[in-house]
Swiss-Prot record:
Its EC number is 4.1.1.65. HAMAP family: PS_decarb_PSD_A. Belongs to the phosphatidylserine decarboxylase family. PSD-A subfamily. The active site is at S182. The keyword Hydrolase does not apply. Its main location: membrane. The gene is psd. It is found in: Cell membrane. One of its GO terms (biological process) is phosphatidylethanolamine biosynthetic process. It comes from Oleidesulfovibrio alaskensis (strain ATCC BAA-1058 / DSM 17464 / G20) (Desulfovibrio alaskensis). This is Phosphatidylserine decarboxylase proenzyme.
Amino acid sequence: MQKATHSITPEGFPVIGLTALAALVFAIIDCWFMAVVFLLLCWFSVHFFRDPERVVPSAPGAGVSPADGRIIKVQPMPDPFTGEPRMCVCIFMNVFNVHVNRFPVSGTVQSIAYHPGKYFNASWDKASTDNERCAYDIVDADGLRWSMVQIAGLIARRIVCRVEEGDTLRRGERCGMIRFGSRVDVYLPEEYEPKVTVGETVFAGQTVLAAKKEQPAE
């Protein structure tokens, strides 16, 4: 299991290095237009692959957002592993968001299912079933099952998974990323309810996405 310790995610170093080198080469041969183009690409790459630290909420039993972005759906959807309807929260990431993904809860990865697919706009309904995606079946400390799905989008063409089946991670711990715009869906256990609404902006590892339902007083 790979852990990021830098302000830039490891996947970004090759891209940043190549664009910086290209800018330098074009500057040396006095091709300033291309030098500026690659310098701007280098700046964009640094911005895209940034990996800021986050303050994970200490509230017990809370599930946090696995991604930066905007909530585009909060509704029941078929679970990717069981097919049964479960409350799902969908987060859309544009190219300007931080794209490092984090674990929504402390728990163990029971299984990982990768599905090659198409690259429809990640905000479309059929992206959940037709696009390239990677699904994680997670069991938390209470034995409750969560599902998290990384979905590639129109521009995103590579899903990065940093965990393996059997790995145990803490809530808010880094677990992967999707390059250049994408979406992450979280399927909640029946015992949890969403704490976000459509249109809300969320931050990975920091925004409380769901909490345990209050038990009715006897």
